[in-house]
Curated annotation (Swiss-Prot):
Quaternary structure (record): Interacts with host IRF3 and TRIM21; these interactions mediates degradation of IRF3 through TRIM21 and ubiquitin-meditated proteolysis.
Family: Belongs to the asfivirus MGF 360 family.
Organism: African swine fever virus (isolate Warthog/Namibia/Wart80/1980)
GO BP annotations listed: symbiont-mediated suppression of host cytoplasmic pattern recognition receptor signaling pathway via inhibition of IRF3 activity; taxis
Top-rank taxon, per record: Viruses
Keywords: Host cytoplasm, Host-virus interaction, Inhibition of host innate immune response by virus, Inhibition of host IRF3 by virus, Inhibition of host RLR pathway by virus, Viral immunoevasion
Disulfide bridges in this chain: none
Subcellular location, record wording: Host cytoplasm
GO CC terms: host cell cytoplasm
Record-given protein name: Protein MGF 360-14L
Function per UniProt: Plays a role in virus cell tropism, and may be required for efficient virus replication in macrophages. Also inhibits the host cGAS/STING-mediated type I interferon production by inducing host IRF3 degradation through the proteasome pathway.
Transmembrane annotation, as ranges: none
Length: 357
């Protein structure tokens, strides 16, 4: 149950006040980082008065605010954020100083933090899907001695489950850096992307691979504009074709000079017919090679379809000269493959060519 003072602070923080009240807010303990604290009563995000809407890239969930307060040794705000609902266990993850550890324990945090609970918190932070959450996860778990007892197999499993992308790294820190970087790229959290890239310039290849894998062409466009990419378009196409329905990434790679035939054949190898038909819709034509690859990979119905070469043609409704990311996304928003529809109609009309496994 909240004390009267804590409840009063919460009520004040949930309302906007003019700058005339700044001195009072400072004395009231609702001041942080040169500005007043505001708490959104709906989403429980903490943000400053300069942001009039929630979910900006500077918003902090209560747990992220707690960790920041622990790092800055702000005992008053630690108590306040826990009273407002922050989990005190988050304050224990970074192995704080003794007096901070004691305070978080007094406020309800369990110590020592068990390995299952540590990994559960990692997954909780990954699910926040916010810029602040990604940066919080990086701050809490990279170079964290509590992870030294966690086996690499366990850590690999947890990070893959949360990101759906295979990760590699010589150390737990290296692995987790790539993990949080991948989540930032997946959701296009530009502030977090720039934060990671500024500190890890050697991860350019990883940045490009993740952006293409997650269909984030905004980030690829930025790298191209800054002339940072020194990777061949066909190699970029390889990353784009790894995931289903990565139409925008495939289109952007094609605009950079990647071969549509290469993209079509890669998609067959990856057993991804939706990406394959998208490449055909854009103008891929090397059906002889595609037929051989389909047969080699035991996709016999697809192999038989490619024998009917006159069945396929470029979809003229897809413009081939769009370069701006948002325009590409808009163009493909309602995209459906005309060549896929033709193939399905042909198989329905010619059931004799269907191979049943």
């Amino acid at each position: 149950m909240l004390s009267l003072q804590t409840l009063a602070k919460k009520v004040v923080a949930c309302n906007y006040l003019s700058s005339d009240y700044d001195y009072m807010l400072q004395r009231f303990g609702l001041w942080w980082d040169l500005g007043p604290i505001h708490l959104c009563n709906n989403c429980k995000q903490i943000f400053s008065y300069k942001h009039l809407q929630c979910f900006s890239e500077d918003d902090l969930c209560l747990e992220a605010a707690l960790v920041k307060a622990v790092k800055s040794d702000n005992l008053e705000l630690i108590r306040l954020f826990v009273d407002w609902g922050a989990n005190p266990e988050y304050g224990l993850i970074r192995v704080p100083a003794v007096h901070l550890k004691r305070l978080c324990t007094e406020l309800g945090g369990l110590t020592p933090v068990s390995e299952p609970r540590l990994l559960e918190i990692l997954k909780e932070v990954a699910k926040l899907k916010s810029c602040a959450g990604v940066l919080l996860g990086y701050d809490m778990f990279c170079h964290n001695p509590l992870l030294e007892t966690v086996t690499r197999t366990t850590l690999d499993t947890v990070t893959y489950t949360c990101s759906n992308i295979p990760l590699t790294g010589d150390t737990a820190h290296h692995l987790l850096t790539k993990f949080w970087f991948a989540l930032a790229l997946r959701h296009n959290f530009t502030k977090a992307i720039h934060y990671f890239y500024k500190r890890h310039k050697n991860h350019l290849y990883w940045r490009v691979a993740c952006s293409l894998y997650f269909n984030n062409i905004f980030d690829i466009h930025e790298l191209c504009r800054e002339k940072e990419i020194c990777i061949s378009p066909n190699l970029m196409m390889k990353f784009a074709c790894l995931r289903k329905k990565n139409y925008a990434a495939i289109y952007y790679c094609y605009r950079l000079g990647a071969s549509l035939d290469y993209g079509m054949n890669l998609s067959i190898y990856n057993n991804n017919t939706l990406n394959m038909f998208f490449c055909i819709d854009l103008g891929a034509t090397d059906f002889d090679r595609a037929q051989r690859i389909a047969h080699k990979t035991y996709m016999y119905n697809l192999s038989n379809i490619f024998l009917v070469k006159q069945l396929f043609s470029r979809d003229v409704t897809l413009a081939l000269d769009v370069t701006e990311p948002q325009e590409i996304y808009d163009m493909l928003k309602s995209y459906t493959s005309k060549n896929l529809k033709r193939a399905e109609e042909y198989l329905t009309a010619h059931p004799e060519i269907i191979v049943i496994d």
